[in-house]
């Protein structure tokens, strides 16, 4: 329940969605279907420019409802690459995708802007060169997002208590996930 509350808190407490993106050429893997769906959601978001970021997060999430849950979506390739899949997802990818779409749309961005946002959100310091660069834990993802100014953790205002419990198993044992 606490994880669910944290994810909901993050989902509805998006801030700085109007901030400037670190736009760079991004190397990614996607499919024509995934790209088309992303462009469709971007167009829907850009058609409602006056909406608050939280409302746009909900809009993006509703636009993506019905896509199947697929575990291990990012482990399909032999080497680490930014994988952009909207036609299949897992829970954290869903949140990352919605946030990236909203941030790109608020900058009147295109698919490339979305890819750049996703890279910044999914990988430590926006660097995707190896499995260990990926933010594997929701807690680390949230802390990195707070550091970048893309999310605000409102758990404390909802009665949550911060626990500083370092987690690093996946990053320290990448061979266990090959």
What are these regions (language model features)?
Residues 22-93:
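Cationic-aromatic interfacial patches
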Residues 67-178:
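Acidic/His-rich structured neighborhood in mature extracellular/periplasmic domains
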């Amino acid at each position: 329940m606490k994880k669910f509350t944290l994810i909901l808190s993050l989902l509805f407490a998006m801030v700085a969605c109007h901030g400037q993106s670190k736009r760079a050429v991004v190397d990614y893997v996607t499919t024509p279907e995934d790209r088309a769906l992303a462009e469709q959601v971007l167009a829907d978001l850009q058609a409602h420019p006056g909406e608050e970021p939280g409302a746009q997060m909900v809009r993006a999430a509703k636009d993506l409802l019905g896509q199947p849950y697929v575990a291990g979506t990012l482990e399909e390739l032999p080497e680490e690459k930014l994988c952009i899949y909207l036609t299949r997802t897992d829970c954290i990818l869903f949140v990352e995708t919605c946030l990236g779409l909203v941030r790109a749309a608020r900058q009147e961005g295109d698919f490339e802007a979305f890819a750049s946002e996703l890279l910044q959100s999914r990988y430590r310091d926006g660097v995707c060169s190896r499995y260990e660069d990926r933010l594997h834990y929701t807690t680390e993802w949230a802390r990195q997002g707070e550091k970048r100014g893309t999310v605000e953790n409102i758990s404390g205002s909802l009665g949550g208590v911060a626990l500083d419990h370092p987690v690093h198993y996946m990053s320290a044992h990448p061979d266990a996930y090959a």
